[in-house]
Amino acid sequence: MYELVQVSEKCYYINCPAKIGVYVADGENVYLVDSGNDKDAGRKVRQILEKNGWHLTAILNTHSNADHIGGNKYLQGQTGCKVYSGGIEAAFTKYPVLEPSFLYGGYPCKDLRHKFLMAQESDVTDFSDENFPKEVEVIPLPGHFFDMVGFRMPDNVVFLADCISSRETLDKYAVSFIYDVGAYLETLD
């Protein structure tokens, strides 16, 4: 687990529970696509980056589920990187209590305020910021969560977040969370 897998000249993914994308913008500056589920994931990611001599420039969040943003705070604190997000996802990333509140229908009881539903807060910069990497295309992928997006890198590698689930994931969880079924079906088309 936490193995770096190369998929193109400049794109990799870190094989872990919530796959983390890596885009090498130049010889040493990299962008992550999501950050894993917690501080421990962030620490393992940082070790992989350091081992390869890479500097983390920013994290590009696909959506605000805790398993995709849980490493943000740790990595931001360790590297000073930016965290990019957009729309409602940016609000949920900045104020993570919103996710269990949304799922529960009110302020979540203590049993719902844990790292699997509520990541630590991140300082967020919107995708529209002038420093967002111009070579990265943001692709709207609504359905699974409010404003989920994917990213197309310059070499046409596309990171699709939770738009598509593996057989293993479907077998493990049996029921997949879909916020908007109609939007999800349109995204798959």
Question: What does each model-identified segment do?
Answer:
Residues 18, 87-89, 97-99, 142, ...:
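Short, flexible active-site-adjacent loop segments at beta-strand->alpha-helix junctions, enriched
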Residues 42-43, 47-132:
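Active-site HxH/HxHxD metal-binding segment of metal-dependent hydrolases
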Residues 15, 39, 68, 91, ...:
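Hydrophobic positions within alpha-helical membrane elements
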Residues 37, 135-189:
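Metallo-beta-lactamase
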Residues 2-52, 150-161:
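Conserved beta-strand hairpin/beta-sheet module of binuclear metal-dependent hydrolase folds
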Residues 14-15, 117-125, 139-142:
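Short gly/ser/thr-rich secondary-structure transition/capping motifs
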Residues 3-9, 110, 131-136:
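Short Pro/Gly-enriched beta-strand edge/turn motifs at strand-loop
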Residues 33-36, 56-65, 83-87, 140-143, ...:
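Active-site neighborhood of phospho(di)ester-bond hydrolases with catalytic His/Asp-centered motifs
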